[in-house]
C-alpha cells in the first residue's frame, strides 16, 4: 500500500504525516532544491513565504479555534509552531527557519515516508494521490490539473512583507509597545505625525510597481493586499487598517500618534522584524526609498524586500467533493491553497483531512467529513459548495454554522466560546474513532 503526495508545503507535510499514522507508505514529491518557485528561497519543507504569524491563539478568534482543532487531529504544523514560537502577544508567530527545519527533520526521519526531489508534471491517474502543490504550482503541472478538473484555473495574487534588521532601526523614534498595553510589548512601533504620514502616503501611491497584466489587477485577495493598493483606496484607508494608531501612546509625546507602522519579531533571536501589513509589489529600489520615509526606518537595512507572486487555485465548488477528492477521479485528492482556502493553517488543515481520507480509501473505509459547525468543516464546505463567484476564504466565525440556541446568545465572546467548545467536542469524538 502506498500513497503519492505531491508538494511538501504545509498541506503536503500534514497529509504525508497523517497517512503514515495509518501504517501506509508515502511517496512525497518535492521539486526543491532542484527547482524553486518565484517566492520560495530555502530548501526545507513547509516554507512560510508571507508573514511569520499564524494569527490569534484566542478561541474567540476563528484562527484560535482552527489551531485547537488541528491539534486534536495530531497536526505536525501545530507541533512545529509551538516548538519554534517567538513572542507575539496573543498571536502565534514562529521563527520561520526553525519552523521549516523542524518539520523537514520530522518528515525525513519518518520511516514510512520516501522523499523524491523531482518536479511532477503529470498527476498519476492510477494511484491514490494527494495534490498539494500550492498557489505557485508550475505551469506544466497546472496544465495537467486543468485537464483533470475540466475547468480553467483561477488566479489571484499574494504579496510578502519586507523584513528589517532590528539593529538598523532608530529607537530614538521607534519604541516597543502592544496595543492598549495588552500582553507583552512585542511590537516595534514607528509613530507618524500628520505631515509625515501624508508625505509617506503620496510617495507610496506614486511609487513604481512591478507591473501585472491588466486582467489580473482586480484579483487581489483582501487578506494579503499590497499596502500601495490599500493606500489607493483613500488617504486615510491605511490609518484604519495596518497603520491604525488606536491604543498606542508615543512615549515622547504622551499622546496617540496620527498613524503607526508596526513591526513584529520574525525570528526567535529577535534580530529580524517584519513590517506588519506591508505586503507589496513595489520595485525593490522604491521599497528602500519609500519605506525609509517612515520615522525610525530612515537607515533601515532590509534583509528581504517584499515580493509579489501569482497564485493559482482550482474551481473547487465545481470539481471537488467535501471529502477533498475530485468528482471525476475519486482517487485524486487536493489540499492546501490550490483548493481555494487562504492562509497557512487553513491550508495545513485541509492536508490533514485529505490525508485521512486518502488513507481510508486505500484501507477500504468510508471517507470522513467534519460538519460545518466546526472550523475545518466550515472551510471545506465553503470551498466545495457551488457558488457564482468563488473566491478564496480563510477561517472566520462567519462561515461556521450555529444552532438556534447558541444564536440567541447576545454576548459575542460567550457565543464564540460556546461554538468553539461544541466544535472541539465534535473533533475529539471523530478523532477518537479515526485513530482508534
Curated annotation (Swiss-Prot):
GO biological process: tRNA methylation; tRNA wobble uridine modification
Cofactor: FAD
UniProt-listed InterPro entries: FAD/NAD-bd_sf, MnmG-rel, MnmG-rel_CS, MnmG_N, TrmFO
Single GO MF annotation: tRNA (uracil(54)-C5)-methyltransferase activity, 5,10-methylenetetrahydrofolate-dependent
A cellular component annotation (GO) from this entry: cytosol
Assigned keywords, A-Z: Cytoplasm, FAD, Flavoprotein, Methyltransferase, NAD, NADP, Transferase, tRNA processing
Localization per Swiss-Prot or TrEMBL: Cytoplasm
Protein family: Belongs to the MnmG family. TrmFO subfamily.
HAMAP family named in the record: TrmFO
Function: Catalyzes the folate-dependent formation of 5-methyl-uridine at position 54 (M-5-U54) in all tRNAs.
Annotated protein name in UniProt: Methylenetetrahydrofolate--tRNA-(uracil-5-)-methyltransferase TrmFO
Amino acid at each position: 500500500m502506498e500513497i503519492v503526495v505531491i508538494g511538501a508545503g504545509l498541506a503536503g507535510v500534514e497529509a504525508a504525516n497523517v497517512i503514515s499514522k495509518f501504517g501506509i507508505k508515502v511517496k512525497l514529491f518535492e521539486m526543491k532544491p532542484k527547482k524553486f518557485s518565484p517566492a520560495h528561497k530555502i530548501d526545507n519543507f513547509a516554507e512560510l513565504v508571507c508573514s511569520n504569524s499564524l494569527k490569534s491563539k484566542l478561541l474567540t478568534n476563528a484562527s484560535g479555534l482552527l489551531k485547537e482543532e488541528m491539534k486534536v487531529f495530531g497536526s505536525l504544523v501545530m507541533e512545529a509552531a509551538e516548538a519554534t514560537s517567538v513572542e507575539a502577544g496573543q498571536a502565534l508567530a514562529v521563527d520561520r527557519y526553525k519552523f521549516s527545519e523542524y518539520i523537514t527533520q520530522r518528515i525525513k526521519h519518518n520511516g514510512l515516508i520516501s522523499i523524491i526531489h523531482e518536479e511532477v508534471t503529470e498527476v498519476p491517474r492510477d494511484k491514490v494521490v494527494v495534490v498539494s502543490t500550492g498557489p505557485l504550482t508550475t505551469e506544466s503541472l497546472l496544465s495537467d490539473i486543468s485537464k483533470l478538473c475540466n475547468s480553467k484555473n483561477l488566479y489571484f495574487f499574494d504579496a510578502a512583507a519586507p523584513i528589517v534588521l532590528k539593529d538598523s532601526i532608530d529607537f530614538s523614534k521607534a519604541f516597543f509597545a502592544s496595543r492598549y498595553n495588552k500582553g507583552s510589548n512585542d511590537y516595534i512601533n514607528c509613530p507618524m505625525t500628520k505631515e509625515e504620514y501624508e508625505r509617506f502616503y503620496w510617495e507610496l501611491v506614486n511609487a513604481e510597481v512591478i507591473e501585472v497584466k491588466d486582467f489580473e489587477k482586480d484579483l487581489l485577495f483582501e487578506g494579503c493586499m499590497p499596502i500601495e493598493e490599500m493606500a489607493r483606496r483613500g488617504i486615510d484607508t491605511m490609518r484604519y487598517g495596518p497603520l491604525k494608531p488606536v491604543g498606542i501612546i508615543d512615549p515622547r509625546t504622551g499622546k496617540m500618534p496620527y498613524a503607526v507602522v508596526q513591526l513584529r519579531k520574525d525570528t526567535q533571536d529577535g534580530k529580524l522584524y517584519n513590517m506588519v501589513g506591508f505586503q507589496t509589489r513595489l520595485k525593490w529600489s522604491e521599497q528602500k526609498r519609500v519605506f525609509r520615509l517612515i520615522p525610525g526606518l530612515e537607515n533601515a537595512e532590509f534583509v528581504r524586500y517584499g515580493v509579489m507572486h501569482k497564485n493559482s487555485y482550482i474551481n473547487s465548488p465545481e470539481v471537488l467533493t467535501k471529502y477533498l477528492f475530485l468528482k471525476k477521479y475519486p482517487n485524486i485528492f487536493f489540499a492546501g491553497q490550490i483548493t481555494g482556502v487562504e492562509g497557512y493553517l487553513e491550508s495545513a488543515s485541509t492536508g490533514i483531512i485529505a490525508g485521512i481520507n486518502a488513507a481510508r480509501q486505500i484501507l477500504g473505509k468510508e471517507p470522513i467529513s467534519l460538519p460545518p459547525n466546526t472550523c475545518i468543516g466550515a472551510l471545506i464546505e465553503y470551498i466545495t459548495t457551488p457558488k457564482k463567484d468563488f473566491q478564496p476564504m480563510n477561517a472566520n466565525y462567519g462561515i461556521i454554522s450555529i444552532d438556534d440556541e447558541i444564536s440567541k446568545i447576545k454576548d459575542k465572546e460567550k457565543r464564540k466560546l460556546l461554538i468553539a467548545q461544541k466544535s472541539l467536542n465534535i473533533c475529539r469524538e471523530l478523532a477518537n474513532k479515526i485513530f482508534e
